Amino acid sequence: MIAQILIADDNPDITGLLSDYLGMKSHRVIVVNDGFQLSQKASEHQPHLIITDIQMPGAYGSSAYQVLQKDPKTKNIPLIFMSAHPYEKLAKLLPNDPKTRFVQKPVDLAKLEALIKELLPLGGYVP
């Protein structure tokens, strides 16, 4: 089974880098550029994992998270939040949920890969 991962970020350099990297790891990648598309595509495709920027047009990643939690199709999808700001500055915006993690930009791909491996089983992915 190929893992399906949704990436949400308004920076095309970030989405391109992550999409290429995850594609090389044999994941199927869906890319969106704002919080509205994030909620819409997550409900439509029901990915195994979402990687989202916290601050982007349409809705902050943390606001999109709240929308995802209200939808039975998406409420159990694990998320990795990304930001250029350190975790300490954003902790109060982020949910206290065992299915969420945080990674700071610029993204350390080895750390991201470890988080993906940790979270994919929570999203129903079976290798």
Model regions: which residues?
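Charged docking surfaces used in two-component/phosphorelay signaling
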Residues: G16-M24
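Acidic catalytic/metal-coordinating carboxylates
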Residues: N33-Q37, Y60-Q66
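Active-site residues of response regulator receiver
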Residues: D53
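Alpha4 helix (beta4-alpha4-beta5 surface) of REC/receiver domains from two-component response regulators
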Residues: Y60-S63, H85-Q104, A110-E118
